[in-house]
Amino acid sequence: WPTAMYFSQHGYDVTVVDNYFRRDACTELDVGMLYPVPTLVERAKIWQQHTGREIKVAIGDLTDAEFMRSLFDGRVEYAWSDAMGFAGIPEIVIHYAEQPSAPYSLINYKYANVTLQNNLLVTNNLMFAVKDFARDTHIIKLGTMGEYGTPNTDIEEGWLEIDHKGRSDRFLFPRQ
């Protein structure tokens, strides 16, 4: 959402797509949010009220190739849009549509399969939609970091103190 607001604020036409997988998975696993977070539609309305700028919202599953293709060929149905017409073929797609692989995928093989299916199919569907409809569209793909193995040390999580080549710092690992 912050990325969408950033580009909207800088004058770009923005469409955000979500299937609420993460929200639903948190509910399923009884690890709900720390505080209530508005839906994408609610956030888009609040954004427009405060800035006068529109962020279109489409709710759907990007593992469904036809839904993905609808975002490129004009068949998309927006859950929120001030002007309901097709936003047009995107110049840039920032692909965040991967679910965090761990710890969700480590629960059991079923959850691991859901993670793999989601993360591979979304990327595959995006590649074919761009190939078939929008070869000039640029893709920026951001995914989760997952590393597996048995190093001869603990795999730390949280704030780490580090000394390296005479410099010291503190940083959050594995995400910063």
Feature map (PLM): residue ranges:
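N-terminal Rossmann-like NAD(P)+-binding domain of SDR-like oxidoreductases, especially those catalyzing
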Residues: 1-176
